[in-house]
């Protein structure tokens, strides 16, 4: 069974007026991972689709997604799949890939229906595409690793880049995940914005009662959302996106937009945050 929700884009002036419930309705994504189901959120931020598939013993097939207006989801799109669960398989275009926890699979435009099987918990990301690049499974060992931060600022972390220009080609999808060193809890701090790309975060590896306080909004009008394990949040191009956890966590970041340059950002000075 496939469930699809649509999220319309919002401008920063309107977002300033929202209360907590309104912010969560507009930007927060809960309940993406349900056993025996595919759950998708079609956003109007660069037409990014975000979702989860949990086969739970029976294969799940992702094919037609009506909001895309095509017969099959990958007719004019590319896709990234991250396994945050147990061992599983993903099949498309006559090939099957074995995916362990933390593996990332890239599927190109034209790959046809996608089948998820096994014990995986598959996080799905899809953006419009203009050409077909080769499908590729990227393991953590294959990813490019960038170390940032320091223990003194509680933000020492390793940024693992998977679907990324320095690892493999894609049309506009950029995907990776960030792991923290012991005692560090701040992500993407100092903050930045990138007006040419949207971004979406999925927080996972959180303990049951742990939370991440995710900060968003214009630098001069910040707000926060409280995130649990396996919850996602969409970041508009005009918004900062950073967070602080009450304990250890990992987060997947994914972007789509005008370019795939990870360094194309506008830093925000601490004195400009409100």
From Swiss-Prot:
Keywords: Isomerase, Metal-binding, Zinc. Zn(2+) binds at residues 192, 194, 199, 241. InterPro entries: KduI (IPR007045), KduI/IolB_isomerase (IPR021120), KduI_N (IPR027449), RmlC-like_jellyroll (IPR014710), RmlC_Cupin_sf (IPR011051). Pathway: Glycan metabolism; pectin degradation; 2-dehydro-3-deoxy-D-gluconate from pectin: step 4/5. One of its GO terms (molecular function) is 4-deoxy-L-threo-5-hexosulose-uronate ketol-isomerase activity. Binds 1 zinc ion per subunit. It holds the Pfam family KduI. Its EC number is 5.3.1.17. GO terms for biological process: D-galacturonate catabolic process; D-glucuronate catabolic process; pectin catabolic process. Catalyzes the isomerization of 5-dehydro-4-deoxy-D-glucuronate to 3-deoxy-D-glycero-2,5-hexodiulosonate. Belongs to the KduI family. This is 4-deoxy-L-threo-5-hexosulose-uronate ketol-isomerase. The lineage of its organism: Bacteria, Pseudomonadati, Pseudomonadota, Alphaproteobacteria, Rhodobacterales.
């Amino acid at each position: 069974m496939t469930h699809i929700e649509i999220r319309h884009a919002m401008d920063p002036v309107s977002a300033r007026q929202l209360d907590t419930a309104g912010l969560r309705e507009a930007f927060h994504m809960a309940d993406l991972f349900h056993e025996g189901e595919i759950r998708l959120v079609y956003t109007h931020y660069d037409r990014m689709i975000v979702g989860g598939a949990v086969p739970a013993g029976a294969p799940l097939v992702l094919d037609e997604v009506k909001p895309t207006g095509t017969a099959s989801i990958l007719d004019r799109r590319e896709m990234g799949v991250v396994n945050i669960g147990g061992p599983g398989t993903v099949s498309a275009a006559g090939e099957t890939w074995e995916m362990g926890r933390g593996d990332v699979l890239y599927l190109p435009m034209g790959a046809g229906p996608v089948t998820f099987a096994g014990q995986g918990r598959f996080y799905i990301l899809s953006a419009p595409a203009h050409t077909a690049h080769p499908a590729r499974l990227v393991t953590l060992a294959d990813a490019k690793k960038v170390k940032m931060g320091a223990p003194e600022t509680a933000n020492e972390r390793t940024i693992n880049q998977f679907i990324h220009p320095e690892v493999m080609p894609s049309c506009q999808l950029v995907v990776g995940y960030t792991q923290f060193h012991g005692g560090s809890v701040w992500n993407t701090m100092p903050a930045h914005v990138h007006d040419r790309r949207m971004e979406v975060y999925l927080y996972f590896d959180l303990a049951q009662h742990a939370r991440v306080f995710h900060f968003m909004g214009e630098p001069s009008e910040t707000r926060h959302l409280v995130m649990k394990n396996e919850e996602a949040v969409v970041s508009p191009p005009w918004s900062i996106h950073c967070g602080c956890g009450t304990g250890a966590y990992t987060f997947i970041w994914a972007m789509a937009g005008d370019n795939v340059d990870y360094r194309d950002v506008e830093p925000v000075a601490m004195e400009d945050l409100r």
